């Protein structure tokens, strides 16, 4: 029998809902992002035999666990079918609702003048603004102690470099927690190096509204590391040389890091050639291939992601 998992879109926020789905044969529930650590612990206590999964990293919807209609309204692309256009992150102007006795506000999207959307605001902020990204790596040990079975990283529309780097960092935190080691704060810095919209702990703990929302910037903030290439193969009869498919600009003299499942390698690029064996100093545009000299000793490297770092 194929196991059935319940999507976060079902908005499971309490033990009664978990038991309801368990009685109908589901094997795992992905809990709503809006739950606190205490609420998650209570659900686990009341539902000891159900697999529970929680989101710990990635983009956050402004709507309740992704139940958003903005993308469908503006562009006829359903956010709940993987086609979200991130309408919540567009540039809006706020207008007083002069005809509204409640004293509310209207939003006007920059490219749709004259189309006004009513919004509501309370002590927690405006529900249509740009959310920061979730980052809960510092809470993994507590979530593991609670008894969560699986952690989920939101990676839709992200590159496989982003997913690989994020998963690698969270794996380090999981292994440290299993070994009863203290949380290593440098993992927070590693995640800062990735492109992000600013980070928040989400609803795991209670914060003021400005902790959750990014009111100043719509666009993703570029990190201090950039994915510049992907390993295609080792160069025959040339020890340490790898063929790289170029993704972004890099050059001789850059500080690089090679991400691999068996461990990362940091080095300064000293030699690069085109596919004809002619020395070059700057990688050509995206999609081209180059050969570079690395500290790799293996003779049959088939996978790796190349990252340019600062310093």
Feature locations, PLM:
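Active-site pocket-lining/capping segments in soluble small-molecule metabolic enzymes
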Residues: 1-12, 16, 30-150, 157-234, ...
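As written
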Residues: 25-26
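Basic, amphipathic alpha-helical/coil surface patches used to engage anionic, phosphate-bearing ligands
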Residues: 239-240
């Amino acid at each position: 029998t194929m196991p059935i998992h319940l999507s976060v879109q079902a908005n499971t926020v309490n033990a009664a809902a978990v038991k309801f789905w368990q009685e109908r044969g589901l094997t795992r529930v992905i809990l709503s992002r809006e739950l606190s650590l205490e609420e998650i612990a209570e659900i686990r206590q009341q539902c000891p035999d159900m697999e529970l999964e929680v989101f710990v990293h990635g983009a956050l919807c402004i709507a309740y666990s992704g139940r958003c209609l903005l993308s469908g309204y503006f562009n006829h692309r359903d956010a709940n079918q993987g086609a979200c256009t991130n309408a919540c992150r567009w540039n809006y102007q706020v207008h007083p609702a002069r005809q509204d006795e409640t004293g509310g506000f209207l939003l006007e999207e920059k490219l749709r003048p004259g189309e006004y959307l009513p919004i509501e605001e309370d002590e927690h902020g405006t529900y249509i603004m740009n959310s920061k990204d979730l980052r809960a790596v510092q809470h993994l040990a507590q979530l593991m102690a609670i008894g969560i079975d699986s952690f989920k990283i939101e990676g839709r529309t992200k590159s496989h470099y982003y997913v690989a780097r994020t998963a690698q960092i969270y794996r380090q935190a999981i292994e440290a927690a299993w070994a009863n080691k203290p949380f290593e704060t440098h993992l927070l810095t590693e995640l800062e190096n990735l492109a992000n919209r600013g980070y928040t702990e989400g609803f795991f703990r209670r914060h003021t509204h400005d902790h959750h929302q990014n009111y100043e910037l719509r666009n993703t903030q570029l990190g201090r590391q950039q994915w510049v290439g992907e390993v295609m193969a080792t160069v025959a009869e040339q020890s340490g040389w790898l063929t790289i498919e170029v993704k972004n600009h890099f050059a001789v003299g850059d500080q690089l890091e090679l991400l691999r499942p068996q461990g990362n390698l940091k080095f300064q690029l000293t030699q690069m050639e085109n596919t004809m064996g002619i020395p070059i100093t700057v990688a050509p545009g995206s999609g081209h291939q180059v050969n570079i000299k690395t500290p790799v000793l293996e003779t049959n490297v088939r996978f790796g992601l190349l990252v340019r770092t600062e310093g």
